[in-house]
Amino acid sequence: MKQFSSNTQSGFTLVELIVVIVVLGILAATALPKFINVSTEARVASVNGVTGALRSAVSLVQAKYYAAGNTAATTVTMQDNSTVTVAAGTGIPAGTAAGIGAALQSTEGFAVDYTTATAVTFRPTNGGGANCQVAYDGSTGLVAQPVTSGC
């Protein structure tokens, strides 16, 4: 009868472990730039998303304004009972927090500058600047083309 030795050891050799570490390092080095680019793409998508939301909000407020039939009114009560400040005669949301800010209902994730009512800017709070924003004109109701060159 053959006896087995209890001194035999099994495992990975040092060369095998080094090869695995090198392969993992190469994979990590090629994947990292792709993840960095994703955050830029996310900011661009978020600016484009708020652009669409602004245009929709203006249209909805104006539709509700004209449906109410009072073209002298300076506020519009929306379906959820929120009040939006508008320009009398046109129903365009004002370039204020009580105007376009209330029409959007949420500006979470954006720094909004209401300093100039004719150029209200929406910038992502995480990495937004002058080259990563969209502007709203409270006098005309127009939403400018988004600027995404610096997101």
Describe each region flagged by the PLM.
Residues 10, 16-19:
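Internal alpha-helical transmembrane segments of multi-pass membrane proteins, especially GPCRs
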Residues 7, 21-24, 48:
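Short glycine- and Lys/Arg-enriched binding-loop motifs that mark or flank ligand-binding interfaces
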Residues 13, 30, 45:
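Conserved Walker
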Residues 63-151:
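Periplasmic/extracellular, small/polar-rich flexible segments of pilin-like filament-forming proteins
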Residues 1-12:
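N-terminal leader/signal peptides at the extreme start of proteins
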Residues 36-40:
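Hydrophobic alpha-helical bundle architecture
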Residues 18-33:
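Alpha-helical hydrophobic helix detector
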Residues 42-68:
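Membrane-proximal N-terminal amphipathic helix
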